[in-house]
């Protein structure tokens, strides 16, 4: 289990979203994609600095560590009626990922859009003992099968530092 202190320290002082504008699939390119669906509600899980606020219609950002969130809460503790679309861009990478996925299943109705880390530690030295969940294409496919999701896309994406991430969209 990841110590809350380590996550809070990491996200409040170490992590920066310097990649956001440069990501091929999961940066600002998502604005047009999501808005074209005219969603009645969008949940941004682990929204960080809430960069999509005001850009994506009907968006609510949750994050347990960042004051820019609309609601300062973790996905594990968040309760709400389901949103049409969920964004999970780097937030489902540590802790009890299986429980987080189970909880997320109740929070979206149409699509969930993910960017995940395949278990590659970040290059910053100050993130304590945070272990990154080892996402793989096979794991993504198993999760889809477990919950009965379709996979609309599954792509490799690279950060500005050259680190691999996976971008995928689940559909119900």
Regions from the language model: what does each represent?
Residues 77-82:
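Short conserved loop adjoining the S-adenosyl-L-methionine
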Residues 1-43, 48-76:
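Conserved N-terminal segment of class I S-adenosyl-L-methionine
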Residues 149-159:
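Conserved S-adenosyl-L-methionine
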Residues 122-139:
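Acceptor-substrate binding/catalytic loop of class I
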Residues 91:
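Hydrophobic adenine-recognition pocket in adenosine-nucleotide-binding enzymes
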Residues 94-104:
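A short, conserved alpha-helix within the catalytic core of class I
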Residues 87:
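A conserved beta-strand element that flanks and buttresses the S-adenosyl-L-methionine
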Residues 109-121:
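Conserved beta-strand signature within the Rossmann-like core of class I S-adenosyl-L-methionine
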């Amino acid at each position: 289990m990841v110590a809350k202190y380590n996550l809070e320290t990491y996200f409040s002082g170490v992590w920066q979203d310097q990649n956001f504008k440069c990501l091929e699939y999961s940066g600002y390119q998502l604005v047009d994609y999501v808005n074209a669906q005219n969603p009645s509600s969008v949940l941004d899980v682990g929204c960080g600095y809430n960069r999509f606020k005001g850009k994506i219609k009907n968006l609510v950002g949750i994050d347990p560590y960042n004051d820019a969130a609309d609601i300062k809460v973790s996905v594990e503790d968040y309760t709400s009626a389901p949103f049409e679309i969920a964004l999970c861009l780097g937030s489902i990478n540590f802790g009890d990922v299986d429980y987080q996925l189970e909880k997320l299943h109740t929070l979206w109705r149409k699509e969930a859009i993910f960017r995940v880390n395949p278990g590659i530690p970040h290059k910053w030295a100050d993130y304590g003992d945070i272990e990154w969940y080892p996402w793989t294409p096979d794991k993504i496919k198993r999760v889809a099968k477990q919950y009965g999701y379709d996979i609309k896309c599954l792509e490799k994406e690279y950060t500005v530092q050259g680190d691999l991430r996976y971008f995928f969209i689940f559909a119900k």
